[in-house]
């Protein structure tokens, strides 16, 4: 789930109290006790056996894989298999992750290989958006047949931006789920490395965009691969190379989200607390498409 793969998408619900705070013996723990046991911390945090380091400021809290799984399942009511591959979570230090207005970032690792960024400056993001919108629309029939509502990709809430200096990519999408009064924000961050990509995702309602964008920009700044795993450490001809570039990375994230939402239960967005973690199998097809078909149109202004 934000995963070392095959990744799965996660849906995180905001609930006033942890679902499984009522334990087998009948004893209950308070929300404060539940959160305290998660062990949220700031400072330098190393993830996945030295793969990367997060320099977590005092304004955030990080929880590790086990605590993240507990929060996702017991606290927010996700099925147990939904947290497979989670490397941890980040949430604002000044808000309990169990509060109705809280949000969090789920972290995973996609070990598809080194992503060549040669196409970064030639991508027409307006054209790519249209392709993603068409792909999302094509899924609607399957969603309706399965008894779920439709999802429309409205547009970029923040257009994709990639830094060749830091090898970090971010973008945000505005989504319209049928029957929901507010549009949904899906904020994506990808950090490119030697053998894969760190995946950080947050989902909230569109009115939260200013807050989420400011916070995610901070997150982008304190997440980095460690020496030996960095983008610059790639050894051509020896290390695995991903079958897609930057365009496929962006399009693949939409495919993962669209494919997953076919399986969602009705009314989930009423909780306004979704976090998509990782890239699901549905993303693979989109990535393969973009590995064969590079955008030829001139780049759109960001």
Q: Over which residues does each language-model region extend?
A:
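Active-site-proximal beta-strand/loop segments in catalytic clefts of secreted hydrolases
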Residues: 57, 110, 174, 201-204
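Bacterial N-terminal signal peptides
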Residues: 7-18
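Sec-dependent signal peptide recognition
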Residues: 2-9, 273-276
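Short conserved aromatic/hydrophobic patches within beta-strands of well-structured domains
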Residues: 58-64, 220-224
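Short aromatic-glycine motifs in intrinsically disordered, low-complexity regions
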Residues: 42-55, 207-218
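Extracytoplasmic/lumenal ectodomains and periplasmic regions of secretory and membrane proteins
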Residues: 176-242
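C-terminal single-pass membrane-anchor helix
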Residues: 242-299
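Conserved polar/disulfide-associated segments of primarily extracytoplasmic proteins
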Residues: 23-53, 65-185, 228, 245-251, ...
């Amino acid at each position: 789930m934000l995963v070392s793969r095959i990744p799965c998408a996660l849906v995180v619900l905001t609930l006033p109290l942890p679902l499984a705070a009522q334990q087998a013996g009948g004893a209950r723990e308070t929300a404060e006790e539940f959160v305290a046991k998660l062990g949220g911390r700031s400072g330098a945090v190393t993830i996945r056996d030295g793969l990367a380091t997060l320099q977590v400021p005092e304004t955030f809290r990080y929880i590790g894989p086990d605590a993240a799984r507990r929060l996702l399942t017991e606290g927010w009511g996700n099925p147990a298999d939904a947290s497979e591959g989670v490397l941890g979570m980040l949430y604002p230090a000044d808000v309990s992750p169990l509060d109705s207005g809280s949000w969090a970032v789920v972290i995973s690792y996609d070990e598809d290989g080194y992503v060549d960024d040669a196409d970064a400056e030639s991508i027409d993001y307006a054209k790519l958006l249209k392709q993603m919108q068409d792909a999302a629309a094509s899924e609607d029939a399957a969603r309706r047949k399965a008894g779920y509502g439709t999802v429309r990709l409205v547009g970029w809430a923040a257009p994709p931006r990639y830094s060749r200096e830091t090898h970090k990519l971010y973008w945000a999408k505005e989504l319209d789920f049928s029957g929901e009064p507010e549009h949904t924000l899906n904020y994506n961050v990808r950090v490119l490395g030697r053998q894969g990509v760190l995946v950080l995702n947050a989902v909230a309602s569109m009115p939260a965009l200013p807050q989420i964008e400011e916070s995610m920009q901070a997150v982008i700044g304190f997440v980095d691969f460690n020496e030996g795993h960095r983008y610059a450490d790639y050894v051509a001809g020896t290390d695995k190379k991903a079958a897609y570039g930057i365009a496929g990375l962006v399009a693949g994230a939409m495919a993962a989200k669209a494919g997953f939402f076919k399986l969602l239960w009705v009314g989930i967005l009423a909780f306004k607390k979704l976090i998509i973690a990782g890239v699901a199998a549905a993303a693979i097809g989109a990535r393969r498409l973009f590995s064969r078909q590079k955008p030829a149109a001139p780049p759109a202004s960001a």
